[in-house]
Design a protein with these regions (language model features):
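His-Asp phosphorelay/catalytic-motif detector in bacterial-type signaling
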Residues: 10-11, 36-37, 59-63, 87-92
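C-terminal output helix
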Residues: 48, 121-134, 141-147
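Conserved acidic segment of CheY-like receiver
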Residues: 11-32, 64
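Short, glycine/charged-rich "phosphate-handling" switch motifs in NTP-dependent
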Residues: 114
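Active-site residues of response regulator receiver
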Residues: 67, 97
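Receiver (REC) domain active-site loop signature in two-component systems and cognate sites
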Residues: 70
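Acidic, metal-coordinating helix/loop segments flanking the phosphotransfer/catalytic sites
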Residues: 28, 42-63
C-alpha cells in the first residue's frame, strides 16, 4: 500500500506491539511529527496483538512495528503466527528491538520479518529511525492487500 493508494481511502493503520510504554510514546511522537494521517493501535504483548489482528471489527494494519521481548507471547512467537496465517502474512512486520544480538536478527528473518531495526538509544536517532521506517513502508513500497482484509 503506498501513500498514493491510501490517500483517497484514509488513514495508515499502524499496529505497535511493545510492552514498554516509553518506547510506544516515542514511536507515537515520531509518527505524529510527520503530520500525516496515521491511526495508531497498540498492544502490550503478542497475545493482545493477535487478538487485535484476528478481530474482524478492527482495521487491518498497513504496518506492524514489533518488539521482541515481551511477556506472555513474545515478538518471535507473534511473528511466527502472523507469517503462518494466510490472512495476515502480507502485512509488513518490522522488528524494532533494543537487541543487536546476531541470533535475534537471524531468528527474526528466519521467521520472515520484513526488516530488523535496532532501537537507537539517542532520542533524535530513535525518532529519525521510526520516520525512515514510515517513509519506506508507507510511502515508497506497494503492497498487496492481505487475503481476508477487513477493509476494502
Amino acid at each position: 500500500v503506498s501513500r498514493d493508494s491510501k490517500s483517497a481511502g484514509g488513514a495508515f493503520e499502524v499496529l505497535i506491539v511493545d510492552d514498554d510504554p516509553g518506547d510506544v510514546l516515542l514511536i507515537e511522537e515520531a509518527l505524529a511529527e510527520r503530520r500525516l494521517h496515521h491511526r495508531l493501535h497498540t498492544a502490550g504483548d503478542g497475545v493482545l496483538a493477535l487478538e487485535f489482528l484476528r478481530d474482524s471489527a478492527q482495521p487491518r494494519p498497513d504496518l506492524i512495528l514489533l518488539d521482541l521481548n515481551m511477556p506472555r507471547m513474545n515478538g518471535r512467537e507473534l511473528l511466527g503466527e502472523v507469517k503462518a496465517d494466510p490472512a495476515l502474512r502480507a502485512i509488513p512486520v518490522v522488528v524494532l528491538s533494543t537487541s543487536a544480538v546476531t541470533e535475534d536478527v537471524t531468528d527474526s528473518y528466519g521467521l520472515r520479518a520484513n526488516a530488523y531495526v535496532t532501537k537507537p538509544v539517542d532520542f533524535d536517532d530513535f525518532v529519525a529511525t521510526v520516520q525512515h521506517i514510515d517513509d519506506f513502508y508507507l510511502g515508497v513500497v506497494r503492497l498487496p492487500r492481505s487475503p481476508g482484509s477487513h477493509t476494502a
